[in-house]
Regions:
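Alpha/beta-hydrolase fold catalytic core
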Residues: 1-54, 77-78, 117-118, 296-303
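Conserved HGGG/HGGXW glycine-rich cap/lid loop of the alpha/beta-hydrolase fold
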Residues: 39, 43-90
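Active-site loop/oxyanion-hole signature of alpha/beta-hydrolase fold enzymes
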Residues: 81-127, 290
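Flexible "cap/lid" loop of the alpha/beta hydrolase fold
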Residues: 137, 144-175
């Protein structure tokens, strides 16, 4: 696919021109998956950890480093794995990666295979939640629970895209070029829309821009176009236990109904964070950690 080839070339060009001095406060490494190399953090020092496992995925333009506080809260209780999806952060996309549901699920299950993780809870957000759903459909015996933030139904997400995402990003090739040229501007403006008005966006922006300077990618056009090709009904009827965490002050999702997610998983519980925007896991990590631990079945754990 031409769009995938364009993304592949643009992201590698940016990486080749970068400073190469990422602020790697967390010990990360790259591993191979069926859909390419991805950058991961793993709290386990070996593959023999007996703790329950949770897998986190940053919602771009966030990167793994944005999750340092949440990781610190969860690590005493869980094996914590965090990885950049292909096309985001430092997981540069392959020339055939089209951000389809099946490819996203392959990335998730590929990480689990590489790290010898039998079962895990997936704690994803926004568009990445759809890849978590497909992973649960593909390997229901391995995905024990879903904890998803700001993920509505795919129908509602398509409507959100039409309202919020500038039209050039929805056009193949043009979107890839525009997204690459203006990724810094897009990241700055995105935090202003996604966060509550009272929240200082500077710490979020600083980590993102530092990552960009070090060669990180932000293939927003690719994921928008990839999910636009998917049929909403293909994600209906997921039976995996699921919790939705919804930030009420997310201006980008002002007209999105979190209850729409029931189309995908009728059994889902919805937890509202009235004081949060688009990133409840980052804005209120201690509260989010308690919700996550309780969902996993560790209600007595103190984050």
């Amino acid at each position: 696919m031409l769009t995938s080839q364009v993304e592949h070339l643009l992201t590698r060009f940016s990486a080749s021109q970068s400073s190469g001095n990422a602020n790697d406060a967390l010990a990360t490494r790259n591993i191979s998956t069926p859909v390419g190399s991805v950058r991961i953090y793993d709290s386990a020092t070996d593959n023999r950890s007996t703790k329950p496992c949770v897998i986190l995925v940053p919602d771009g333009p966030n990167v793994i480093e944005h999750y340092d506080a949440l990781i610190a809260l969860l690590t005493p209780h869980l094996r914590v794995v965090c990885f950049d999806m292909p096309g985001f952060g430092f997981s540069l996309p392959q020339s055939n990666y089209a951000h389809s549901l099946n490819q996203g699920a392959q990335a998730v299950l590929g990480v689990m295979d590489a790290l010898k993780i039998d079962t895990a809870t997936l704690a994803f957000s926004c568009a990445n939640g759809f890849y978590a759903l497909r992973a649960a459909q593909t390997a229901p015996q391995r995905i024990t629970r879903l904890v998803l933030s700001q993920t509505p139904s795919l129908t509602a997400m398509h409507a959100w895209t039409s309202r919020v995402v500038p039209w050039p990003l929805r056009v193949p090739v043009l979107g890839q070029l525009a997204g690459w040229l203006f990724k810094r501007k897009a990241a700055r403006s995105w935090y202003g829309i996604a966060l509550p008005r009272s929240t200082d966006a500077a710490p979020y922006q600083e980590k993102t821009l530092n990552a960009f300077n070090s060669g990180a990618c932000f293939c927003l056009a690719g994921v928008v176009q990839g999910l636009a090709r998917e049929a909403p009904a293909s994600l209906h009827g997921v039976t995996t236990p699921c919790t939705i965490v919804w930030g009420a002050l997310d201006h980008s999702h002002k007209y999105t109904q979190p209850q729409s997610f029931i189309d995908c998983a009728p059994q889902a519980d919805i937890v509202h964070f009235a004081d949060c925007g688009h990133f409840p896991d980052l804005e209120q990590p201690a509260r989010y950690a308690q919700v996550l631990l309780h969902a996993i079945g560790l209600p007595s754990a103190t984050a």
